[in-house]
Amino acid sequence: MDIAVIGSNMVDLITYTNQMPKEGETLEAPAFKIGCGGKGANQAVAAAKLNSKVLMLTKVGDDIFADNTIRNLESWGINTTYVEKVPCTSSGVAPIFVNANSSNSILIIKGANKFLSPEDIDRAAEDLKKCQLIVLQLEVQLETVYHAIEFGKKHGIEVLLNPAPALRELDMSYACKCDFFVPNETELEILTGMPVDTYDHIRAAARSLVDKGLNNIIVTMGEKGALWMTRDQEVHVPAFRVNAVDTSGAGDAFIGCFAHYYVQSGDVEAAMKKAVLFAAFSVTGKGTQSSYPSIEQFNEYLSLNE
């Protein structure tokens, strides 16, 4: 295995709307879509579509969504040995609202994701030890995330933490044990309490976390691209301009693609450049996983735009 994704899966309930209703108001929305999502599953699918060998640890509910989620993961070649159903529990769901500017707002109901435990990681230990990178998010219990970080460090496996959704109670001492810490602008603002309205503000906020001990921070910044910072260097990868249709899952697209190319090459900057292009491709289509390109589509896209 190349990559282990330990985290969430969700059923995306996507509403496309020109405006959000006020309290007590009913509005008609022009479109609705159901898809497979969740930050963990999105990142796993993005990497798998690029032909990474991916192992997924997650929990699904005891409902109509569960089998579809498992089939979807398997359809992309993801190892689902440790995707388990939780009896008498709903699957995680994510109502997503996409506005006229193609920006999105998301609510999550964790459902079965809450039951992914440190013990699940221990049960998968022998297979996890074969992976080169562990990818984590914060849509599961923090104790599970912390245990996964410790597992990676104990066994010499690199760890990437995507602190999404941002939780102020995140113990940054664990984040500092990770090889990569990958927030977006909003998450960076919440975690630091610092403004992120300009590029210089983002740099300052990122630097504040590096000064606290982070090894590598990569901030995804949408139309501003991505920023990689360590104690000794700083690299800005500009965004590739496209006509965005739906930005849902773009950050996950970046992380899945980055994970794939980093594991292949060990070159952070080169992996970032490809991940920025992969994320740009993803926002030109509707949905999350459904908007991610296959390896063939992405190679063609790279040949035209690199």
Curated annotation (Swiss-Prot):
Chief location: cytoplasm
Active-site residues, as the UniProt record annotates them: 252 (proton acceptor)
Principal EC category: transferase
GO biological process, one term: D-ribose metabolic process
Substrates-to-products reaction catalysed: 2-deoxy-D-ribose + ATP = 2-deoxy-D-ribose 5-phosphate + ADP + H(+)
Residues that coordinate or bind substrate: 10-12, 38-42, 139, 252
Activity control: Activity is stimulated by certain monovalent cations, including NH(4+), Cs(+), Rb(+) and K(+). Inhibited by Na(+) and Li(+).
Necessary cofactors: Mg(2+)
Site residues by UniProt (Important for substrate specificity): 10
Induction: Part of the deoKPX operon. Induced by 2-deoxy-D-ribose. Negatively regulated by DeoQ as well as by DeoR.
Cofactor remark from the record: Has an absolute requirement for divalent cations which is best satisfied by Mg(2+). Can also use Co(2+), Cd(2+), Mn(2+), Ni(2+), Zn(2+) and Cu(2+), with lower efficiency.
Keyword Protein transport on entry: no
Residues that bind K(+): 246, 248, 282, 285, 287, 291
Keyword Lipid metabolism included in the entry's annotation: no
GO CC, one annotated term: cytosol
pH effect on activity, per entry: Optimum pH is 6.8-7.2.
Annotated EC: 2.7.1.229
Pfam families in UniProt: PfkB (PF00294)
Record family assignment: Belongs to the carbohydrate kinase PfkB family. Deoxyribokinase subfamily.
Main function: Catalyzes the ATP-dependent phosphorylation of 2-deoxy-D-ribose to 2-deoxy-D-ribose 5-phosphate (dRib-5P), allowing the use of deoxyribose as the sole carbon source. Can also use D-ribose and 2-deoxy-D-ribitol, with lower efficiency. Several ribo- and deoxyribonucleotides can replace ATP as phosphoryl donor.
NCBIfam families in UniProt: D_ribokin_bact
Note: Located in the deoQKPX locus, involved in 2-deoxy-D-ribose utilization. This locus is absent in E.coli K12.
Assembly and interaction partners: Homodimer.
Name of the protein in question: Deoxyribokinase
